[in-house]
Curated annotation (Swiss-Prot):
The keyword Transcription applies. Pathway: Amino-acid biosynthesis; L-arginine biosynthesis [regulation]. It comes from Bacteroides fragilis (strain ATCC 25285 / DSM 2151 / CCUG 4856 / JCM 11019 / LMG 10263 / NCTC 9343 / Onslow / VPI 2553 / EN-2). GO terms for molecular function: arginine binding; DNA binding; DNA-binding transcription factor activity. The gene is argR. Keywords: Amino-acid biosynthesis, Arginine biosynthesis, Cytoplasm, DNA-binding, Repressor, Transcription, Transcription regulation. It comes from the Bacteria. GO terms for cellular component: cytoplasm. This is Arginine repressor. Belongs to the ArgR family. It holds the Pfam family Arg_repressor_C. GO terms for biological process: L-arginine biosynthetic process; protein complex oligomerization; regulation of arginine biosynthetic process. The keyword Amino-acid biosynthesis applies. InterPro entries: Arg_repress, Arg_repress_C, Arg_repress_C_sf, Arg_repress_DNA-bd, WH-like_DNA-bd_sf, WH_DNA-bd_sf.
């Protein structure tokens, strides 16, 4: 079991520190770390770790870890912080609805972070590839919503 735990840790570290876009690339990286495994084993490991693919800064789709097990990336910002600082485009309001425009591939993870925060202003979100629709609570003001969102998306102001 120790071998598997070490392998899972290695997978998390590789995904957190490098842009890996395919299982083949990940198998090569693991091989360089001394792990010998099949594509089927790697596939099961990725499923167990709940690894997904998301657009990177250059538009390439790469493996990412869920937020709760994300290791600190090399550099000053975590992947989540980089995403929030660079993916946001605009925020507009209409009645009890707000719309956030993002770069392609960013909306889903931003909506996930919004939905996982306790909010007195937002009931929920619906996300596409580059757009998030927010349903606002009765009486929520644009100022209050913008303040709440600034806790998640720092460059929203």
């Amino acid at each position: 079991m120790k071998k598997k735990a070490n392998r899972l840790d290695a997978i998390k570290m590789i995904i957190s520190s490098k842009e890996v876009g395919s299982q083949e690339e990940l198998l090569q990286e693991l091989g360089q770390e001394g792990f010998e495994l099949t594509q089927a084993t790697l596939s099961r490991d990725l499923k167990q770790l709940k690894v997904a693919k998301a657009a990177s800064m250059n538009g390439r789709y790469v493996y990412v870890l869920p937020n709760d097990i994300m290791y600190k990336r090399v550099g000053d910002q975590s992947a989540s912080e980089m995403l929030m600082n660079n993916g946001f485009i605009s925020l507009q309001f209409s009645g009890n609805i707000a719309v956030i425009k993002t770069r392609p591939g960013y909306a889903s993870s931003m909506a996930y972070d919004i939905d996982n925060r306790e909010s007195d202003t937002i009931l929920g979100t619906i996300a596409g590839d580059d757009t998030i629709m927010l349903v606002l609570r009765e009486g929520a003001t644009p100022t209050a919503v913008r303040h709440f969102l600034s806790l998640i998306i720092p460059n929203i102001n």
